[in-house]
Amino acid sequence: MSDISLSQLLEAGVHFGHKAYRWNPKMFPYIYSEVNNIHILDLVQSATLLKEANLYLESAARENKTFLFVGTKRQASTLIAQEAKRCDSYYVNHRWLGGMLTNWSTLKERIAHLKDLEQQEANNTFDLLTKKEGALRRKELKKLRRHLDGIKDMKNLPDIAIVIDQKRETTAIRECRKLGIPVVSILDTNCDPDLVDIPIPGNDDAVRSIKLILKSLTDSILIGKS
């Protein structure tokens, strides 16, 4: 299991929440104090729940479970793709398309179309088309890659979802809940802990905070797989 110390959490700014007026009262148990109208999260609880999440993911990886990383905000997008690839998992790091999980059969058709276009590109088929048609297909390929590249090799629904920014990814979380897919999520002070299975109280806006927690979760998956 990947262990993170309190000093590491503190240094990464994991404890900084949102302005007090933006809080969700359900996050009260995880809040340590309020300083200059900013809520400060209890890092002891953050460390404890991160450890719990790490143990859960390590155990799941040992059982060959599959993982879907979700984070479409600017601060998380690159990290989501990077960490998902590092542990050979799937990811959505741009816009979540409604029905990505709940309408999986239709989405698989879009993925098949993406792979067909990629094959056409590899075979230089685009160059044989009219300039306009070739440009249209390249544009479509670029758009499909942006949205589906991280899940194009996903054969079935994932076993577990790892989410950054619960408030932003409400559609993804709603689909996971509907399908019974457990959700591990970083929860800032404006989030609702009732909507996830394993909450990790933490700053979901700062890159250093997201990076530290995501890396720890990914390390645990890799330990389980090994």
UniProtKB/Swiss-Prot annotation:
Q: Where in the cell is it found?
A: Plastid, Chloroplast
Entry protein name:
Small ribosomal subunit protein uS2c
* Assigned keywords, A-Z: Chloroplast, Plastid, Ribonucleoprotein, Ribosomal protein
Its chief place of residence is plastid
Which molecular-function annotations from GO does this UniProt entry contain? structural constituent of ribosome
Q: Does the keyword Cell inner membrane apply?
A: no
Per the record, GO CC terms?
Answer: chloroplast; mitochondrial small ribosomal subunit
Presence of keyword Ribonucleoprotein? yes
Give the superkingdom in one word. Answer: Eukaryota
Show the CDD domains listed in the entry: RPS2
GO BP annotations, alphabetical order: translation
Q: Which family does it belong to?
A: Belongs to the universal ribosomal protein uS2 family.
Pfam families registered for this protein in UniProt = Ribosomal_S2
